[in-house]
Amino acid sequence: MKKMLVAYDGSDASKKAVDMDLKCANKEDEITLLTVVPAELAESSFTKMLLPTIDLSSIVKSGSFKEKAKETLSQIVKEIEDHVAKVNIMVEDGDPADEILITAKKTEADIIVLGYKGYGKEGRFLLGSVTDKVVRHASVSVLVVR
């Protein structure tokens, strides 16, 4: 049984990471889906810096970025739960790369799967700064998906 950690931020690259993880996973494997809400978002109910899957009007109604992230991950669980033994969801706040690395240790992940780039401030693509940091500092293998 492998324990796989998949970092998900709603970007196309992270959606491809989920798809690739499923291709690599066996029926007896365990997948943890992780979304990291940058600290600035977790502490603010109104900001211009939005995750791509989070619509501001829904935040005002639901009250929190973390709740919306959990809802999004729960939808993904429904799509993949029949393919593996267990699917966990985690939503953390803080620095995305740091939280991915901490969660990998906490969950005893055998591999980290993430997209090669994600979303940054105001929807602009980062040039893989989170991915780069995870690859350089991870104590387990990292699968970077394009």
Show the residue positions of the predicted features.
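Absolute protein N-terminus
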Residues: 1-2, 146
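Small/aliphatic-rich secondary-structure junction motif
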Residues: 2-55
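Amphipathic, non-transmembrane alpha-helical secondary structure
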Residues: 15-22, 74, 98-101, 105
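Short conserved AdoMet
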Residues: 25-27, 81, 139
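General small-molecule cofactor/ligand-binding pocket signal
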Residues: 32, 88-92, 143
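Structural beta-alpha unit
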Residues: 78-112
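Gly/Ser-rich helix-loop-strand patches that form or flank binding pockets
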Residues: 102-146
